[in-house]
């Protein structure tokens, strides 16, 4: 007879937590009861309410339910699917702040993982903020026996 494993109940939603920084994958980072919490949709400096999505031994994950005090770099996402598909996780942050955050992530990774600190950092090359992703890749297979292309 197999044992049924019960799904662990998630803690109650939290209100009024301050976001300290941004993770490498664009989630807000806060600390609660000595544990890191990675919160989707939160920006550094914001005060937010969030609900838990998962709890782990070393960290928790959550999603913003309300922004009580917005960051000055928060903007209205242009994509109607923002927050659903995951393709543009920083669209709620103005583009200059996105570039700065990504550059800081690169420098942190060089320092901590590569044990390298660059002497100089060149200015970032930028292009248009919107409409630059125009490439699509589709898989096609010719099935000779069926006389079709899948």
Model region roles, listed by residue range:
Residues 1-150:
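Non-catalytic accessory regions of SAM-dependent methyltransferases
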